[in-house]
């Protein structure tokens, strides 16, 4: 990750090498979420990590949209993100970044972790059992995400037996930057703010794959 040369205004999400953690970049500031040897979560501000993949984009200015609609789950959230992205004329096929400011009713998240034996016989069930769960309630957070109808296998979960490809990948960050993780599901009851990149030029959406396997 330390090879990234353009960091100013950069937003990105990705996974640490061998699925040993998550990475989030917020306005040029990296937060790495990992587990220590005792499976306790550790959050570090550093560029010194090897990654499996990273999707990123420089965003200097955001358009803020007030959303007064409750969200019961990830599916409803995703529908709203795409609805407003289309209204803004964004590239909903190839992908776009978004940012959310909110007080969540609930968030289910995780920090990626993969045991060697799980990696040898990889399955979604095995990975989920290895991941470190994070649950939040009634807490103000920020969410950085990337969405696109062709995101599955590019920068979101690919299609697997019994599960469709995902169109959205997002991480949360606490207001004090002390905690972060990959968002699995969420519930929103209060008014929230959805932000999109203001189109001043063509979007430079970068997706880097560093390894061939377990890329998401």
Language model: regions and residue ranges:
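Contiguous hydrophobic, core-forming segments of folded domains
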Residues: 35-96
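Exposed beta-sheet edge/beta-hairpin loop segments within beta-rich domains
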Residues: 154-164
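Extracellular structured ligand-interaction cores
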Residues: 20, 95, 165-169
